[in-house]
Regions:
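Catalytic-site microenvironment of enzymes
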Residues: 2-166
Length: 166
């Protein structure tokens, strides 16, 4: 419950960076069953990786990452909708088979201007903190949105660390 309270604080701070006209995509990471078939990691790339990895599990709670990500994603969806935002959910159930590439295509097709992919990554027992990833300025497929993505990502990380103390 503390996490959800902190998420609400974060949300209140960061939503000022977006207009209510923008559509937000929430992609709760992973799913009940991984898909170890491979796909390219980006358009035109020769590098491949599994379509969807299995994810991790909480050390204390034993809760699977895919389940936690969906629970948080649904609460975030409801909070954003209550503030007037249009929200697209990549998944609303754990029993899906959606590859990483398919998730990106779904988001683009939905016309989302903000893409939030939720994960609870694993680390050593002393690991604490948060990670925010954004596209590279060198990526030709995301060059037009890279600066705004970077600014938004940094704001999320800043507000998250203020709200959680990490």
């Amino acid at each position: 419950m503390k996490l959800l309270f902190k998420l609400a604080i974060l949300l209140s701070s960061v939503t000022g960076l977006m207009s209510a006209a923008e559509k937000v995509c929430i992609d709760p990471g992973h799913q009940a069953k991984g898909n170890m078939q491979t796909e390219e990691i980006a358009p035109g790339s020769s590098k491949r990786k599994p379509k969807v990895a299995y994810g991790t599990r909480g050390v204390a709670t034993k809760k699977p990452e895919y389940q936690l990500a969906l629970e948080i994603g649904l609460k975030l969806r409801d909070a954003l909708k209550a503030k007037g935002y249009s929200v697209f959910m990549v998944r609303e159930t754990n029993n899906v088979n959606i590859s990483n590439k398919e998730r990106a295509l779904m988001t683009n097709k939905a016309g989302c201007s903000v893409y939030l992919r939720l994960h609870a990554d694993a680390g050593g027992s002393s690991a604490r903190g948060a990670t925010v990833l954004t596209s590279s300025a060198k990526n030709p497929h995301t060059r037009s949105v890279q600066k705004s993505s970077d600014r938004f990502s940094r704001a999320i990380l800043s507000e998250y660390t203020k709200a959680t103390g990490f």
